[in-house]
Amino acid sequence: MFNQKNVAFVITDPQVEFLKSTGKGFGATKDVLEKVNTIENLTKLFALAKERGYKRFISPHYFYPHDHKWQFKAAGATMMIENEMFWRDSQYSAIPEGSGADMIEEIKPFLDEDTIVVNGHKIFGPESNDLNLQLRKNGIDTVILAGMNANLCVDSHMRELIELGYNVIVVNDAVGAPGEEAYQAALTNYGYIANQVLTTEEVIAQL
């Protein structure tokens, strides 16, 4: 059984861009989202985690005007920046309601003082944000990981957190991916790298 003292949820990119039809990445992810009921399962996890007192860490994606000035970019970053995905006009202004950078409405009721939104990760993994620091300062050594995209940000967070010494459980039906091939590739990697791979219902049974 999990416990609230040293176990927390880490959710990558639970934002409009890949999860809702108005998002610029939704066309690539919608089939897998529908197949595994990603939004429904993420909502279940958020709701029960709040009810039972588990901390929730969100590692979001944001891009700003200054990111356009990067002198070199990898393919994924180039695509996102050129299409102004996860876009914010400024670090000093609020995120526009319903924009690609906004959190999906389904999880907003569960965002409270036990939800820690860390700095945005810039490419795929948490190396460039404060996720590790926040987890350590909160006494967390076990992470239940879910979110978007299964083969990119979720995979990269899993790898880095494993390297940092965390016990990482990936929730395989609370993720989404840009197509079935990408989803299956992610599942293969989870099986080799994560400490455990569980379904939403299997996680809920241990909360």
How would you name each of these model-derived features?
Residues Y54-H61, V171:
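Short beta-strand segments at enzyme active-site cores
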Residues I39:
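Glycine-rich loop(s) and the adjacent beta-strand/alpha-helix scaffold that form part
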Residues V10-T12:
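Short hydrophobic beta-strand that contains or immediately precedes a catalytic carboxylate
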Residues H61-Y62, H121:
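Beta-hairpin (beta-strand-turn-beta-strand) motif
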Residues L19-K35:
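Acidic/histidine-rich helix-loop elements
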Residues P14-T22, R56-I58:
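Short N-terminal secondary-structure initiator segments
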Residues Y64-H68:
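Short catalytic/ligand-binding loop motif for oxyanion handling, primarily in non-cytosolic enzymes
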Residues M1-A8, E17-F18, K35, K44, ...:
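Active-site-adjacent betaalpha module
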